[in-house]
């Protein structure tokens, strides 16, 4: 616990309170968090948490690859107007959670085409869901790696 500090509240000198002094988050934890977002699984690899890296990072990679294989569509900022453009933002943020996987696909133009034939596939919506889950799961993996590096979790 933190140090005991005597506080004068209304003339009562006998009352004491425990104040916890929070340590600042180490800079290395921020680096681990950024690396964990950028390359799924790398945050745990940097900390030599091999099992977590394989399971959590592997799940993100697997979901992303399966989502693309099923013909899923990744979201980006659309050129639409009004609420149509705003409705693209939350799924884009979820997809962006996949880090470098999203960036590479964006640079190569893979998964971003608005093709009616792609949307007609029976697995299209499953692919979308897998891509969204990959990004969201990577956010959770990133937070887990950050908490371990910050000393909040074993």
Stretch-by-stretch model annotation:
Residues 2-33, 56-154:
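Transmembrane helix recognition focused on a "late"/terminal membrane span
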Residues 36-41:
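Hydrophobic, membrane-inserted alpha-helices
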Residues 45-55:
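Membrane-interface helix starts
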């Amino acid at each position: 616990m933190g140090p005991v500090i005597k506080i004068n509240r209304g003339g009562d000198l006998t009352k004491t309170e425990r104040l916890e002094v929070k340590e600042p988050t180490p800079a290395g934890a921020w680096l681990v968090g950024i690396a964990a977002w950028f390359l799924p699984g790398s945050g745990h690899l940097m900390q030599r948490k091999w099992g977590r890296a394989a399971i959590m990072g592997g799940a993100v990679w697997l979901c992303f690859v399966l989502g693309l294989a099923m013909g899923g569509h990744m979201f980006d900022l659309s050129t639409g107007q009004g609420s149509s453009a705003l409705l693209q933002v939350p799924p884009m943020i979820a997809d962006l959670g996949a880090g470098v996987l999203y960036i590479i696909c964006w640079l190569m133009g893979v998964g971003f085409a608005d093709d009616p034939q792609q949307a007609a596939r029976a697995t299209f919506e499953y692919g979308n869901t897998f891509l969204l889950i990959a990004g969201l799961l990577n956010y959770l993996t990133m937070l887990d790696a950050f908490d371990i590096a910050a000393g909040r979790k074993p």
